Curated annotation (Swiss-Prot):
Residues 108-354 form the GS catalytic domain. Its main location: cytoplasm. It catalyses: L-glutamate + NH4(+) + ATP = L-glutamine + ADP + phosphate + H(+). SUPFAM superfamilies: Glutamine synthetase, N-terminal domain (SSF54368), Glutamine synthetase/guanido kinase (SSF55931). This is Glutamine synthetase. It comes from the Eukaryota. It is found in: Cytoplasm. GO terms for cellular component: cytoplasm. Its EC number is 6.3.1.2. Homooctamer.
Length: 354
């Protein structure tokens, strides 16, 4: 399938005067964990989320409602600047609700918000490491030899140079777009498998972690669309001796970040161990293909922890263990997680003692 996006043809129109009106692009999570969007015109610059209307869409076309009762409502939840249109135009992350006012089954933000409201005094911070893999229009890993394979893993992680990294221009575009949009992106790097990359978002407190990661994902797939490239969040996109893709989740509370916080980190690890199976249940589909005990993972059936151990379920960074306070890294979440589910269950387990 050829790339049908014509940036050169579009550019002159994006510079046209909009008058006092702006474009607000609503973005939501569909029934299959993907992202959807549509745009409305707003009569003036938006400075507060309360100025935006509740909108609706055909949920029968997104696997979120039956055809005979298909209206699903979009309630604005967070606003970001629009890096595609510029100016005062905005991106609106929206929650989905059924016509009876209940949250749609795919709306995990609704529950997460309740959890974080309850845990607010503990100031839970998160940082997510989103790994993903790029494919070309023919579903081949981007930049790989046609009908063949690149050399074994080794030179690609944080690599530089032709043959070691692929699509750096796309990755740089995404990084800058996130910064412009107001997403708290904190870094990028090429990953162990060629054509696999990672971006980090955070630290973000509470519900904002999910908001920022979902919008960062949206920007990624939109920019990849312009390049004619596909983005896969599958945790094991290729069989064989290739690393899978995760979404390592860094977590701390106010008590963990203060002097003597190591005790609270150890307490949290004990609590996480007791609910291992419940966490795995929301840590991503097909995660068993990734959590094999190989390729820098712990086995999906076993809980483990250790200092600087990338083969453990929970890793405590060495500098954290040395200084006696900081954060922990949960290495179990897959790349295709819903961040609202992962961050909220961590807060439930470690803070609310659910």
């Amino acid at each position: 399938m050829a790339n049908t996006y014509h940036n050169d043809l579009l550019a002159p129109y994006l510079s046209l005067d909009q008058g006092d009106k702006i474009q607000a692009e609503y973005v939501w999570i569909d029934g299959d964990g993907g992202l959807r969007c549509k745009t409305t015109t707003v009569s003036k610059k938006v400075t507060d989320i309360g100025q935006l209307r509740i909108w609706d869409f055909d949920g029968s076309s997104t696997n979120q409602a039956p055809g005979h009762d298909s209206d699903v409502y979009l309630r604005p939840a967070a606003i970001f600047k629009d890096p595609f249109r510029g100016g005062d135009n905005i991106l609106v992350l929206a929650e989905t609700y059924n016509n009876d006012g209940t949250p749609n089954r795919t709306n995990h933000r609704h529950h997460a918000k309740k959890v974080f409201d309850e845990a607010k005094e503990h100031e839970p911070w998160f940082g997510l490491e989103q790994e993903y893999t790029l494919f070309d229009a023919d579903d081949q890993p981007y930049g790989w030899p046609k009908g063949g394979f690149p050399g074994p893993q080794g030179p690609y992680y944080c690599g530089a140079g032709t043959g070691k990294v692929f699509a750096r221009d796309l990755i740089e575009a995404h990084y800058r777009a996130c910064l412009y949009a107001g997403i708290n992106i904190s870094g990028i790097n090429a990953e162990v498998m060629p054509s696999q990359w990672e971006f980090q978002v955070g630290p973000c407190e509470g519900i904002s972690m999910g908001d920022h990661l979902w919008m960062a994902r949206y920007l990624l797939v939109r920019i990849a669309e312009q390049w004619g490239v596909k983005v896969s969040f599958h945790p094991k996109p290729l069989k064989g001796e290739w690393n899978g893709a995760g979404c390592h989740t860094n977590f701390s509370t106010k008590a963990m970040r203060e002097a003597g916080g190591m005790k609270f980190i150890e307490d949290a690890i004990e609590k996480l161990a007791k609910r291992h199976d419940e966490h795995i249940a929301v840590y991503g589909e097909d995660n068993d293909l990734r959590l094999t005990g190989r390729h820098e993972t712990g086995h999906i059936s076993n809980f483990s922890s250790g200092v600087a151990n990338r083969g453990a379920s929970i890793r405590v960074p060495r500098h954290v263990a040395s200084q006696g306070y900081g954060y922990l890294e949960d290495r179990r979440p897959a790349s295709n997680i819903d961040p609202y589910r992962v961050t909220s269950i961590i807060a439930e387990t470690t803070i609310l003692d659910k």
